[in-house]
């Protein structure tokens, strides 16, 4: 034994020594990498709805962005950066994939999800050993839209949201706190962190002291607040001594029109105020400020990061690696033609806006096309289409060429159908969830020009915003005026029906629902609302027929199957109701409310052929498991099921737990029901026990 120990000692000593030396060498190399300014980490910060000209480092008249300014003073600043679309989801898809909307097929918020055939920057960096994380500040970038591809952690769940839990966004301060925690956790790994700040998006309500300091320009105040929050993250990088080894990129998805050209906010037009964004690269090891005036795009971020990290870019990337600009001299590059679009106006039945931007010039294709000399006319006030037809034709040909090379057919599976909560989330952010945009890129000279509908768009958008504020009477007055102008715009009929349903005016909702379906048939949500209204009016059979149409149009909609089942229960068609509940659970077995309802049916039905106490207990227990035995309603049902099977002790114990939880949650009505149920159990149990003892 002793000889073996002596023999093993040298090898163990060598192993320990090797580990120690390896650790020292690794630390030395890491420290050396820091000192030499090599890129170890990547931090990409996107400020939603941020015009480039509102940053003080881009020349804004007031000091809005001191933290970004300090970073920019030692960074490469691009002064002419074009977003391919002034809409949050598609713009971020372009930012992370390096491709334009015709290729990645995302043209609007909440209508599409990013196909897995696309390759994101997060996927590329994860494949190269980076820890990948994202902190998202608005529902519009929720992972259900496919943009979370490649992220190890994608924080899009809002524990606290703006304005009393009613707005599907989080403030920048909370975003920064989550980011700081993430950095602390991953400080010893090489990482890619994507941060999304939503604060400059309307409504403009910056917190103090920014609200007072920028009382005359609240949009600028929101940008100043976002800068303050970004500063907290940059300070954390310094504290962790990661600032010298982290590539920091600050940009935006799009700008904001602020009333220019008649548009209140963004999404509709593609003028420079909406599509010109900041882009700043702070590269480790480089401290000299440099401004690049060349026209570049948001799609250049992904290939530039790949170029700096010596990672091959996927062949489908349409952006260009800008790292050649980061040296002492500027490279000679070919002339760029940057694509930009808004298909948003097509929802009103008018033409799209498709544009191309090159150094100093911009062409917009629509019913009345536009050409602007951006060098002399940055506000795009003078349309030169008639004065310079040859230049317009050249740019039109370039636009046609871009589309021919990039447009891909959309996979129907990548279209999104939103549930009611998702629609409310979007409305809370000021977005209109309704008609799909037209993405066929067909141009029809006979269609109206989007410019002619901007006031209609602004008013309609304000009306949908008032819905979230529950100013229903005002919404109805606006809709009636808009209907006088465009009586065949089905979304107005849908909105009038929605308001009537919210006010429980079911009879008033019916004509708008029927007219909406007449104008645009085959929409399952409208059939669903019609079914609800008919059910509330006591027209159960008609209601069920409408619900069946919903299932034909959306066969995987479990909520509709559950609602059909409830209508059948009202008609006392218990067996048919059970069939619908079962079909719903076959599609999604993780529905505690549906399991709970079925358990109650099997435990209490008067039909002896359907009564099944064993199944009732099984379903009720499953509902309790899915809610961690913390929901009083499911425990109450489990108690009822146990009692129906004669398991009175278990029934009493579950009822006691349910009562305690209901009292804690202040669910007084439910607590009273449970208390009566418990009293009846306690009254029955002694009689049963005495009956057993007499035997």
List each language-model region with its residue ranges:
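Terminal, low-structured helical/coil segments at or just beyond the last alpha-helical repeat
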Residues: 610-612, 622, 629-632, 644-648, ...
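Canonical positions in the second alpha-helix
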Residues: 481-482, 515-516, 549-550, 583-584, ...
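Catalytic domains that recognize anionic headgroups
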Residues: 2-532, 536-539, 566, 570, ...
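Structural marker of alpha-solenoid helical repeat scaffolds
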Residues: 485, 519, 553, 587, ...
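Helix-start (N-cap) detector for alpha-helical repeat units in TPR-like alpha-solenoids
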Residues: 456, 490-491, 524-525, 558-559, ...
């Amino acid at each position: 034994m002793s000889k073996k120990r002596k023999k093993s000692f040298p090898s163990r000593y060598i192993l320990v020594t090797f580990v120690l030396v390896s650790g020292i060498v690794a630390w030395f190399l890491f420290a050396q990498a820091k000192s030499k300014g090599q890129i170890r980490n990547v931090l990409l910060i996107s400020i939603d709805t941020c015009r480039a000209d509102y940053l003080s480092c881009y020349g804004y008249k007031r000091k809005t962005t001191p933290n970004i300014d300090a970073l920019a003073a030692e960074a490469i600043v691009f002064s002419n950066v074009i977003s391919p679309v002034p809409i949050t989801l598609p713009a971020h898809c372009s930012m992370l994939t390096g491709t334009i909307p015709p290729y990645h097929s995302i043209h609007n918020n909440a209508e599409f999800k990013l196909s897995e055939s696309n390759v994101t920057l997060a996927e590329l960096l994860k494949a190269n050993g980076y820890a990948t994380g994202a902190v998202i500040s608005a529902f519009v970038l929720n992972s259900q839209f496919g943009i979370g591809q490649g992220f190890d952690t994608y924080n899009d769940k809002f524990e606290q949201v703006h304005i009393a839990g009613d707005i599907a966004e989080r403030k920048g301060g909370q975003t920064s706190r989550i980011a700081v925690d993430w950095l602390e956790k991953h400080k010893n790994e090489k990482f890619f962190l994507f941060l999304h700040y939503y604060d400059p998006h309307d409504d403009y309500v910056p917190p103090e002291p920014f609200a007072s300091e920028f009382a005359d320009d609240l949009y600028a105040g929101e940008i100043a607040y976002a800068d303050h929050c970004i500063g907290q993250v940059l300070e954390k990088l310094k504290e962790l001594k990661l600032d010298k080894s982290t590539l920091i990129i600050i940009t935006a998805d799009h700008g904001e029109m602020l009333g220019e050209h008649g548009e209140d906010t963004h999404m509709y037009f593609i003028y420079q105020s909406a599509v010109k964004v900041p882009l700043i690269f702070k590269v480790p090891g480089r401290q000299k400020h440099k401004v690049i005036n060349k026209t570049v795009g948001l799609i250049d971020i992904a290939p530039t990061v790949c170029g700096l990290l010596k990672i091959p870019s996927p062949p489908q990337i349409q952006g260009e690696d800008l790292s050649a600009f980061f040296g002492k001299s500027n490279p000679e590059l070919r002339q760029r033609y940057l694509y930009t679009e808004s298909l948003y106006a097509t929802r009103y039945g008018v033409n799209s806006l498709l544009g191309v931007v090159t150094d100093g010039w911009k062409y917009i294709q629509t019913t009345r096309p536009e050409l602007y000399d951006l060098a002399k006319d940055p506000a795009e006030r003078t349309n030169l289409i008639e004065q310079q037809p040859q230049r317009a034709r050249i740019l039109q040909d370039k636009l046609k060429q871009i589309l021919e090379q990039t447009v891909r057919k959309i996979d129907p599976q990548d279209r999104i159908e939103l549930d009611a909560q998702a629609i409310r989330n979007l409305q809370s952010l000021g977005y209109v969830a309704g008609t799909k945009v037209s993405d066929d890129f067909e141009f029809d000279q006979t269609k109206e020009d989007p410019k002619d509908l901007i006031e209609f768009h602004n008013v309609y958008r304000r009306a949908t915003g008032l819905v979230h504020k529950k100013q229903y009477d005002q919404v109805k007055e606006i809709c009636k005026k808009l209907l006088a102008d465009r009586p065949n715009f089905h979304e107005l009929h849908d909105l009038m029906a929605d308001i009537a349903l919210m006010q429980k005016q079911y009879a008033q909702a019916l004509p708008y629902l029927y007219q909406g379906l007449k104008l645009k048939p085959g929409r399952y949500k409208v059939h669903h609302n019609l079914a609800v209204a008919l059910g509330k009016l006591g027209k159960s059979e008609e209601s069920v027929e409408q619900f069946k149409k919903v299932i034909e149009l959306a066969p995987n909609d479990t909520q509709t199957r559950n609602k059909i089942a409830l209508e059948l229960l009202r008609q006392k068609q218990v067996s048919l109701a059970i069939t619908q509940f079962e079909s719903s659970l076959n599609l999604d077995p993780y529905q505690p409310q549906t399991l709970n309802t079925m358990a109650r049916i099997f435990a209490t039905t008067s039909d002896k052929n359907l009564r099944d106490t064993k199944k009732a207990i099984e379903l009720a227990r499953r509902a309790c498991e899915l809610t961690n035995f913390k929901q009083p309603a499911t425990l109450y049902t489990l108690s009822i099921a146990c009692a129906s099977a004669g398991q009175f002790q278990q029934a009493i114990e579950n009822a006691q737990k349910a009562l305690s939880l209901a009292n804690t949650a202040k669910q007084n009505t439910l607590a009273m029901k449970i208390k009566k149920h418990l009293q009846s159990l306690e009254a029955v149990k002694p009689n049963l026990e005495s009956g057993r003892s007499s035997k």
